[in-house]
């Protein structure tokens, strides 16, 4: 799927569907490559675009398809989706036809309109074999920008040419890369956390988690999930046969609250928060 804001003055996205980008292909032949490139061809000359890479979760955010039926939880999720939608809008407006991004490459005898912007879904792009995908990106794009964080199940596109801004591997967006336990130890703050290595067989829930109603469970290569304490032991023993597992508390009496902070930060709010934490 390709969403393009490149042509004319219209701001409406134009969706192009192609079997070459939505299905897997193992062919290394030129016809397949030509079809792939043609599906992403540019309408005006050969001006390269900026590609914004996203995964299928972005569609769910914009459609609000994952809202909880519980009113209190649904309101928090709706606020989260709204903030992410605003961040996407601001990112799109900044990247699309931004003259400041092409100052060094602009020709003095040619008008500077900035680069057009395309939204590329990672699942479709990764359906191409690596060689074909690399040729498509090099032919059509001057810069790749990844949505962050991408879902852990999706391996994002990594590229040196064109330059890529964003997480190069899924582990960059994972709890393991962020090293939560180390940060909690240094700052002296954070929820009770326990990292269990693969193959561990706990016979009972550790005492530190006995008083909590729900726990946040994160295993390697998967997004975290909230599990009731009453049946977490069975799930833990099953997950530990495949990977290491990080256990964190998520609600002392009821459902815990997770705060999602969209980037970029608002400078005024950032200064207020810094003052608040510094004075507390």
From Swiss-Prot:
Protein name: Putative uncharacterized protein encoded by LINC00869
Gene name of the encoded protein: LINC00869
Region annotated Disordered, chain positions: 1-36
Organism (species): Homo sapiens
UniProt similarity note: Belongs to the FAM91 family.
Pfam families: FAM91_C (PF14648)
Source organism, top-level taxon: Eukaryota
Record field: compositional bias (Polar residues): 16-29
Highest classification ranks of the organism: Eukaryota, Metazoa, Chordata, Craniata, Vertebrata
């Amino acid at each position: 799927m390709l969403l393009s804001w490149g042509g004319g003055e219209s701001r409406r996205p134009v969706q192009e569907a192609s079997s070459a980008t939505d299905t897997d292909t193992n062919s290394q032949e030129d016809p397949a490559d030509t079809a792939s490139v043609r599906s992403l061809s540019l309408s005006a000359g050969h001006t390269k675009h900026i590609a914004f890479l996203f995964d299928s979760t972005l569609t769910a955010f914009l459609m609000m398809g994952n809202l909880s039926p519980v009113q209190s939880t649904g309101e928090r999720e709706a606020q989260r989706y709204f903030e992410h939608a605003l961040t996407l809008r601001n990112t799109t407006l900044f990247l699309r036809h931004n003259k400041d991004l092409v100052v060094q490459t602009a020709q003095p005898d040619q008008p500077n309109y900035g680069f057009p912007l395309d939204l590329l879904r990672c699942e479709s792009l990764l359906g191409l074999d690596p060689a074909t995908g690399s040729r498509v990106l090099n032919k059509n794009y001057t810069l790749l920008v990844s949505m962050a964080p991408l879902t852990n199940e999706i391996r994002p596109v990594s590229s040196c040419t064109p330059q890529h801004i964003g997480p190069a591997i899924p582990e960059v967006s994972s709890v393991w890369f962020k090293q939560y336990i180390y940060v909690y130890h240094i700052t002296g703050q954070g929820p009770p956390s326990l990292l269990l290595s693969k193959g561990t067989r706990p016979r009972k829930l550790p005492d530190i988690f006995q008083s909590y109603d729900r726990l946040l469970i994160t295993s390697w290569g998967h997004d975290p999930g909230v599990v009731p304490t009453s049946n977490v032991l069975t799930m833990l023993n099953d997950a530990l046969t495949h990977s290491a597992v990080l256990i964190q508390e998520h609600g002392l009496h009821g459902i815990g609250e997770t705060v999602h902070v969209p980037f970029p930060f608002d400078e005024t709010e950032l200064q207020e928060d810094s003052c608040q934490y510094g004075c507390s």
